[in-house]
């Protein structure tokens, strides 16, 4: 698949991005390389392969949830320039 200006404009609009004119050719080249790589992956014959969710027999081992006290809020708020209780204090911007 060739990435042309029309497709790049559509992608630019859908992604809400603005691409500089200097970067357009480079972006088109990179997108073409990505699409070519995906095309190669799509050509692989996987009909004889069985779908695998996990390579570990019995699935992924999970740890038990262990409740413990956390000091994360205080750790984060100690770097705040201003705080009120467990909240950041910021200037009022909406009346």
Swiss-Prot record:
Keywords: ATP-binding, Ligase, Nucleotide-binding, Protein biosynthesis. Pfam families: GatC. Disulfide bonds: none annotated. InterPro entries: Asp/Glu-ADT_sf_sub_c, GatC. GO terms for biological process: glutaminyl-tRNAGln biosynthesis via transamidation; regulation of translational fidelity; translation. It catalyses: L-glutamyl-tRNA(Gln) + L-glutamine + ATP + H2O = L-glutaminyl-tRNA(Gln) + L-glutamate + ADP + phosphate + H(+); L-aspartyl-tRNA(Asn) + L-glutamine + ATP + H2O = L-asparaginyl-tRNA(Asn) + L-glutamate + ADP + phosphate + 2 H(+). Its EC number is 6.3.5.-. Belongs to the GatC family. Heterotrimer of A, B and C subunits. This is Aspartyl/glutamyl-tRNA(Asn/Gln) amidotransferase subunit C.
């Amino acid at each position: 698949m060739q990435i042309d200006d029309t497709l790049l404009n559509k992608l630019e609009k859908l992604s809400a991005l603005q691409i500089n004119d200097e970067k357009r050719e480079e972006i088109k080249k990179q997108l073409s390389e990505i699409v070519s790589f995906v095309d190669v992956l799509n050509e692989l014959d996987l009909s004889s392969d069985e779908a695998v969710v996990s390579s570990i027999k019995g699935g992924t081992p999970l740890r038990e949830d262990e409740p413990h006290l956390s000091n994360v809020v205080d750790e984060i708020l100690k770097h705040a320039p201003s705080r009120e209780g467990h909240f950041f204090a910021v200037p009022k911007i909406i009346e």
